[in-house]
Amino acid sequence: METAMTTQQGLNEVVINKVQRMIENKAVGVQATMERLVNEGKIAQDYIAPIGVELRRNDHSPIITFSENGHVLMNMQSGQYTLHGNAIGQLADKMGIPSRYLRQLASGDEWQRQLAATVLNEHSGWTQRTRVLIRTVGQQVRGVLSDSYRRLNSVEILTAFVQEASQQGAVIADAYMSDTKVWAETILPQPIVV
């Protein structure tokens, strides 16, 4: 019985050491991810923008327009924004433009980017959709969603998750953030003895 207990303790130590090394090896990436999340959370803005045929019927000029200046740009009252590839695909979807076609135009030569801006201006003026939710981070549009989309704050959600996990004894083992995704993985650093 004592040999089995010693073997189990040895296995537990191996697991603990392996988990600790994994946590230490990923600590820099986890820290960078969490800093990026907080920093981008400070500059993220959501706008509800009216678009479509309703504006035309009521003789209103467009609230958002598109132009080309090295990139396809979205112009709003709050400023001029570059379009992330994700936003271009979502704009295409919302306005009934083939997504692949619009992405190719937006990343092409100057004449193609100008054509992309023209296509977006025409479609945004005639779409049956009346409003969209625009998510910006700094001077870049990252997402164009339905105006009924439930807006969630990733900073608050991930912070609450990490705090609760920490109260349960867990630590962040890995984390990742791109322009459109964020996730964090937690682990209990001590094995659970059964």
Task: Label every model-predicted segment.
Residues Y149-V194:
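Intrinsic disorder/low-complexity polar-acidic segments
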Residues E2-A160, E164:
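Feature for intrinsically disordered/low-complexity regulatory segments and propeptides
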